[in-house]
Amino acid sequence: MDFLDFEKVFSFYSKATKKGFSPFFVPALEKAEEPAGNFFLDRKGNLFSIREDFTKTVLNHRKRYSPDSQIKVWYADFVYRYSGSDLVAEYQLGLEKVPRNSLDDSLEVLEIIVESASEFFEGPVIVEIGHTGVYEDLLKEIPKDLHEKVLNLIDTKNLAEIEFLSHMKKIDLSRVEKIIEDSIYRRSPEHLKTMDLPLSVREDLLSASSFLQEKFPTVSVEIDLTLARTIEEYCGLIFTIYDTSSSRLVAAGGEYTVNGEKGVGGSIFLEGKTC
């Protein structure tokens, strides 16, 4: 890690501690009883798990040591994931808060992540916000055996395939088409009031977009209702941040529910390298 990255860590630490987040430091390697996730055996045959996701690490730590307490932490360290046969280390800065009590908790996380990403990357950055409640509402009207197919097509914004599926199965997928069209052509928050959304979803998106536009007038805020299909635990408001100068995803996060408990978190992706 270079000097500029240390400056980013210090800047992030300053913002997080001002909001009451405590540091979270645990080893990336832990002894394991059985293979799970990313793991390896040392020369003596000891099995170790490798940290691949900070949210899971934080939740497991809380479950093990303080299951009934609130945890509100910031972190700065590597996660390890396989890309093909290569183990890749990615340095992340992030926040986690469990339990999540209100939308204000999510906006607090969003504020720190967006402010930091705006400073760390050349930009300008684009913040995309979505909501998993969109899928929950849409799927009520669709046969269960088609859920995964429809969700995959929403993922890829594939309007042509949605129209074909609607014709072949003789089911009305016009609301799905509208959600995809809105996510392609009507991404400005000003269109939220005319979108076909559950009231609670619309209110969350309006609150989050208004908050961001007021706090960060130079940041572009867009609505993408097709977000978050890749992380099953997401449940509620979600976001991604893109750096337009490098054309890459630089941060992501949102609300989640794990084992019936609500939380919120977000991560900034600083550095990736093959181990």
UniProtKB/Swiss-Prot annotation:
The pathway to which it is assigned is: Amino-acid biosynthesis; L-histidine biosynthesis; L-histidine from 5-phospho-alpha-D-ribose 1-diphosphate: step 1/9
UniProt keyword terms in alphabetical order: Amino-acid biosynthesis, Cytoplasm, Histidine biosynthesis
| Domain of life according to the entry | Bacteria
Which biological process, per GO, is one annotated for this protein? Answer: L-histidine biosynthetic process
- Presence of keyword Amino-acid biosynthesis: yes
Q: Which Pfam families match?
A: tRNA-synt_His
Summarize subunit and interaction data from the UniProt record for this chain.
Answer: Heteromultimer composed of HisG and HisZ subunits.
PANTHER family given in the database record: HISTIDINE--TRNA LIGASE, MITOCHONDRIAL-RELATED (PTHR43707:SF1), HISTIDYL-TRNA SYNTHETASE (PTHR43707)
Q: What else is known?
A: This function is generally fulfilled by the C-terminal part of HisG, which is missing in some bacteria such as this one.
Q: What is this protein called?
A: ATP phosphoribosyltransferase regulatory subunit
Q: Which organism is it from?
A: Thermotoga maritima (strain ATCC 43589 / DSM 3109 / JCM 10099 / NBRC 100826 / MSB8)
